[in-house]
Amino acid sequence: LITGLVTLTAGCKKKDMSLKLNEPRNIRGVVSYKRSFPDLNDKHLAVAQAVGICPPEDRDAAEKMKEQLIHITDNQFYTVDSLTHSIPYLVPRASELLDTIGSNFLDSLTAKGLNPNQIIVTSVLRSQSDVKRLRRRNGNASANSAHCYGATFDVSWKRFKKVEDEDGRPLQDV
């Protein structure tokens, strides 16, 4: 009887629903973004032209190229933002790279003692008409965008999506 009572009360233990805190360790900052992330558009564009598709004039033309592209949607590595000036397609090599970056980001957070978060994809394939519309709003947008080749994607550098705790505990922001 006592053994059964102990077993019964042990099974009724209340779940810990306190805020799951980050336990940061071994985190180093970036000294020079220019050196760490040499974002050279001419080199980027040359690679996109070599491995990408022929730039579609509009979204209808892009739809006709779907057999050459991978449709990207939310998965365990990343989430796709609401896209206003691009459509969620990439060439296979770029899609694989996006998966790798998302996976590496999750692994890096774990290694640094931080709660899991997914990267947020903010831009992918753009048609020529998407670029034209974007340039009206964003003076920094390139007329000859590597996004038009389906070999380029952007991710947010400051917004992330929390991966929900399997026990439902709230997580501290990263």
Where are these regions (language model features)?
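Bacterial N-terminal signal peptides
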Residues: 1-7
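A general, composition-driven signal for non-globular sequence regions
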Residues: 7-8, 120
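Cell-envelope/glycan interface and biosynthesis
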Residues: 66-174
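Extracytoplasmic cell-surface/polysaccharide-interacting catalytic and binding patches
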Residues: 12-111
